Amino acid sequence: MFFSLFLVFALGIIGGLIFEKIRIPKIIYYILLGILLGPSVFNIIDKSLIDISSYLRQIALIIILTRSGLNLDINNFKKMGRSALLLSFLPATFEIIGITIFGPLLLNINVFEAMLLGSVLAAVSPAIVVPRMIKLKEEGYGNNKAIPEMIMAGASMDDIFVIVLFYSFKGLVSTNEFNAVSLLSIPLSIILGLSLGLIVGFVISFIFKKININKILLTIIVLGISFGMVALETALKNYVSISSLVSIIVMALIINIYNKDKGNEIKGTYNSLWQVFELLLFVLVGVATDVRYALSSDGAILVGLILIALVFRSFGTIITMIGTDLSFKERLFVVFSYLPKATVQASIGAIALNEGLMAGTIILTGAVISILLTAPLGALLIDFSYKKLLFKEENIKNEINIS
């Protein structure tokens, strides 16, 4: 296992730096590296590392959700208004609808499996979008209408919305039936998860205010409690459904609201943790990918399905901007910004396969193809279009100085 980890980190860091230099998202390289090192090509990765990959992916998901909660700014939603709120769920909803309609027609899957596939593919990638929006904001592009802030606010909630839907749909696929009990269990698990997160968040915030704790210990406490909430969900699943993922997000959000300084310290440490788990996550997704299936006719059909879904998604994104003062060019830029996928697809794409669901291979392959297709496409569209599509605020200052 240790030699495998050495290869993953050594080759991952070197190749990742090269890809960043040529302005291609490094996660693309990580996935390709995993495919090369995995059973599909050279079969170098030790089986013991593959055996614990599902646990590593779950830890990565916990880190993703905690960072989402810590970075979620409620004031941004108040400031951005209706468009930011709609961006947090409407494009993803349209994409899921598109896949639910066309998935059963094009692939050998039922409606529930198509919904599950849609929930995996529907999330936008903050890992690609957020750094670029920060860069735009610093350069003054789109600031006159707060476009970078609107996109960041919507994208942060988009992931949370899709992940909650994924776990809800997974329950439907596992039972393969849709009845009143299964329908009621979805909002109940969310409400219970929300309640647990609020209680734990307020208690932790109170303790953190009363006791001076260094940032490393703060991180260990929050991470340990997150593990505990996931374990609680597993222990109680035969009696009551609790969404531990919602609990983790809400806990992090409460800490950030009521103890901003401590929240920022935890955020910094979690960002460092993510650097490690990002590499592991995407490489292990590549390792789990069945290249023969991806290159088969079903793989080609998945590419077509993803493109159809992106059309649905883009239509949903356009609807969110109806009634705003955004120009055609600015609306087009928002559509581009909502195309790239990566983090969520990598963290939940293999879960269906690990749990033995019939559509597991299709879902994982779809997740990988969506990353390889949309991550570089979205990144390049953002990078090469923003100067043409967005207004630069400095122009106003220059006009004032000249006059």
Task: Tell me the role of every PLM-derived stretch.
Residues 1-403:
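Transmembrane helical cores of multi-pass secondary ion antiporters/exchangers
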